[in-house]
Amino acid sequence: QKIGIIYQFYNLIPTLTVEENILLPIELDRKKVDKEKLENILKFLNLENRKKHLPNELSGGQQQKVAIGRALMINPTIILADEPTGNLDSKSSKEIIELLQKANKEYKQTIIMITHNLEIAKLADRILHIEDGEIKNT
């Protein structure tokens, strides 16, 4: 479990709270929940006051933060982010990108992001352009 995945459409379980959605991969693996780590992630994502809310009570940006929290909870070496800002407004998109950059720096995680947004792609250390299944330039 060294890869955390962040989906474009969040893929949150609608009947689970923010906290329960973040803990889902840990509980599915029957691992012990690290409550301190959970609280640190909620603070990192600025979701401490929303941890008992259901996904439908959150904005799109907050839902994407929950998806990021779920990925961070498993201590991945790599985070694969598939269009993480695709469904967000520009303010929320900026916030999500800043969180991913912060995760890269603070948690030493490699972020692999798929995006069609050139402005977001330009923020990366390295860009791979894939066209028709082939890498065209790097």
Question: Where are each of the predicted segments found?
Answer:
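Short coil-to-helix segment of the ABC ATPase nucleotide-binding domain corresponding to the Q-loop/switch region
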Residues: 16-23
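Conserved catalytic loops of ABC-family nucleotide-binding domains
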Residues: 2, 102-113, 121
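ABC-type ATPase nucleotide-binding domains, specifically the catalytic core motifs of the NBD
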Residues: 23-35, 44
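Conserved ABC ATPase signature
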Residues: 54-64
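Catalytic Walker B motif of ABC-type/P-loop ATPase nucleotide-binding domains
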Residues: 79-82
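Hydrophobic anchor residue at the start of the ABC signature
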Residues: 68
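A short, proline-enriched helix->beta-strand linker immediately N-terminal to the Walker B motif
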Residues: 73-77
